[in-house]
């Protein structure tokens, strides 16, 4: 700020904001004033002509007093608005700023008075006798005897101009403080200000290194105004320079916190390693520190980004054997999200609703012991045979539950996976906690559950096959689980092969080739996506005699056009 007071009130920023508000309000108050005058005139016309009384044949005598009150109110509002407009127009808030501040504040030349920095500095800086505690020492060098109240600050003219290179300093003689002081972030902060020579100044022209403690408090006033009541804070006029300045000072503060005794010496300044010096120049400094081996990080050697990159490259190599279009991998995340959504909305949500409906029917029929999630799979299969006419969907539901003896966990986990729309609780290599007990390998993983319900759903969509009387046409033809192994030598084998149980890993077998996508949380989804993509591109969208497109299962929409 370019004011001469110690604590200006209001500040330059506040006055600038107020001036902008006045400029914006000038047009608004004028409009309101004209509106109030118009309303008052209309009411006065009605009072004199009695238009309402004549037109509506109203003789209510308080009406005139109501109109008088409204006319008076609008008139007073109009007078107040015109007074504000006159005040903002005739006597607006004016500012005295430097050209740099005018540019930063975005002020128009018509509303400010621009004063050259030299004149402003000349009106603020007055010579004063030097303090004995700083006589004969560097202006910005550290002195243990210096009291906190005498810490030097930048003058208002210190920051009026910046240069990309350090201004030269005179090495001899005495100098007087110049209002054209320049600051350079390239100097490494070992030199900060330039002084013009004059025999009247008691201060040396050399400037020592900047201390790293109390950094921001030490760069605020000229050397001739440590305790002067006219010294004033200033703002840097360039954001890039300010950022560079603060970053370098924070680096120096960090060196001080490390406990280095030479942190304030020129050798440990930010430019210490920028000079062309030999190793011998650092011998005295380096021998003070003991060489220690760094602790080995507990994190894995390859971070997540590197693992993802390797996984993506491996996936590209596998997909390149299926299609030459390498841009497909750019859509893989979108395909995976759509596929998860399809499984949730098409299989899991309807399955949970049907299970709850069947359980309700069982209770109404007086069979509470056959509640799904409590009864065993064997009991449910027998009930499906006996009560098939009453509950025809029970047999289809039992096929989805024929995965693990722990029916309660399976049902609860399917309910959890059906929530959220996109299986947000899915965990590829484990499952959910059950009755306060953490998941263990005696329970199926989420990948196993999703693969089972997916295969069972397609079993229900494919027509019956005489070779598979149990109705598991898709599962028997297109899914193989270890310890069983597919016949890779058979060209007609087209299946998903689960080669590992914990953690689960899936591979695709197609035309005597094994396509093994990268392991991890998306292995199952990506393998199934490749399975469906081959059906779409190489099998014309047909899985046997069933169309997986719009006219059939309607799952190939996830690939778009």
Curated annotation (Swiss-Prot):
The protein's role, per its UniProt record: Nuclear envelope protein which in association with NUP205, may be involved in nuclear transport of various nuclear proteins in addition to MYC.
Localization per record: Membrane; Nucleus envelope; Golgi apparatus; Cytoplasm
Annotated region described as Disordered, given as residue ranges: 120-156, 196-233, 250-270
Transmembrane segments: 28-48, 60-80
Complex formation: Interacts with NUP205.
Gene giving rise to this polypeptide: Tmem209
GO cellular component, one term: nuclear envelope
Positions where Phosphoserine occurs in the chain: 9, 11, 98, 201, 248, 278
The entry's keywords: Cytoplasm, Glycoprotein, Golgi apparatus, Membrane, Nucleus, Phosphoprotein, Transmembrane, Transmembrane helix
Name by which UniProt lists this protein: Transmembrane protein 209
Protein origin, superkingdom: Eukaryota
Low complexity: compositionally biased ranges: 138-152, 260-270
Pfam family, one: CytochromB561_N
Main localization (coarse): membrane
Residues of this chain annotated as glycosylated in UniProt: 57, 274
Bilayer topology: Multi-pass membrane protein
InterPro entries, per the entry: Cytochrome_B561-rel
């Amino acid at each position: 700020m370019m004011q001469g007071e110690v604590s200006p009130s209001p500040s330059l920023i506040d006055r600038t904001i107020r001036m902008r508000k006045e400029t914006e309000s000038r047009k608004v108050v004028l409009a309101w004033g004209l509106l109030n005058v118009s309303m008052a005139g209309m009411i006065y016309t009605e009072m004199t002509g009695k238009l309402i009384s004549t037109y509506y044949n109203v003789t209510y005598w308080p009406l005139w007093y109501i109109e008088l009150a409204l006319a008076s109110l609008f008139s007073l509002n109009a007078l107040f608005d015109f007074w504000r407009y006159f005040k903002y127009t005739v006597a607006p808030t004016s500012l005295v700023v430097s050209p740099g501040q005018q540019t930063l504040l975005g002020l128009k030349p018509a509303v400010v008075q621009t004063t050259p920095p030299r004149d402003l500095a000349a009106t603020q800086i007055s010579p004063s006798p030097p303090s004995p505690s700083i006589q004969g020492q560097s202006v910005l060098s550290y002195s243990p005897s210096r009291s906190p109240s005498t810490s030097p600050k930048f003058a208002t003219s210190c920051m009026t101009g910046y240069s990309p290179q350090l201004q030269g300093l005179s090495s001899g003689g005495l100098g007087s403080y110049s209002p054209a002081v320049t600051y350079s972030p390239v100097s490494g902060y070992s030199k900060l200000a330039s002084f013009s020579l004059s025999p009247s100044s008691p201060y040396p022209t050399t400037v020592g290194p900047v201390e790293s403690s109390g950094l921001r408090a030490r760069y605020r006033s000229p050397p001739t105004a440590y305790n002067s009541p006219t010294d004033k804070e200033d703002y840097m006029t360039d954001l890039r320079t300010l950022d560079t300045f603060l970053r370098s000072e924070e680096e120096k503060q960090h060196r001080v916190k490390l406990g280095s005794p030479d942190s304030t010496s020129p050798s440990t300044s930010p430019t210490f390693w920028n000079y062309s010096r030999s190793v011998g120049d650092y011998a005295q400094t380096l021998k003070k520190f003991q060489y220690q081996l760094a602790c080995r990080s507990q994190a894995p050697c390859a971070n997540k980004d590197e693992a993802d990159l390797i996984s993506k490259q491996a996936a590209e190599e596998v997909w390149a054997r299926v299609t030459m279009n390498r841009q497909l991998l750019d859509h893989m995340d979108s395909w995976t999200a759509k596929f998860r959504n399809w499984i949730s909305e098409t299989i899991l949500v309807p399955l949970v609703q049907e299970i709850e409906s069947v359980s309700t029917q069982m209770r109404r029929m007086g069979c509470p012991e056959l509640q799904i999630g409590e009864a065993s799979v064997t009991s449910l299969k027998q009930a499906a045979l006996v009560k098939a006419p009453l509950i025809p969907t029970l047999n289809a539901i039992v096929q989805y539950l024929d995965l693990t003896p722990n029916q309660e966990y399976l049902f609860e986990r399917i309910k959890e996976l059906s929530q959220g729309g996109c299986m947000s609780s899915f965990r590829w290599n484990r499952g959910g906690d059950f009755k306060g007990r953490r998941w263990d390998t005696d329970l199926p993983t989420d990948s196993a559950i999703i693969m089972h319900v997916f295969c069972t759903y397609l079993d229900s969509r494919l027509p019956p096959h005489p070779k598979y009387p149990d109705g598991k046409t898709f599962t028997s033809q297109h899914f193989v689980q270890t310890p069983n192994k597919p016949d890779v030598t058979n060209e007609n084998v087209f299946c998903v092969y689960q080669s590992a149980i914990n953690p689960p890993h899936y591979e695709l077998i197609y035309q005597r080739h094994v396509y093994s996508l990268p392991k991890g949380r998306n292995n199952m989804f990506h393998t199934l996506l490749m399975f469906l993509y081959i059906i779409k591109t190489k099998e014309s969208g047909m899985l046997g005699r069933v169309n997986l497109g719009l006219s059939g299962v309607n799952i190939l929409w996830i690939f778009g056009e």
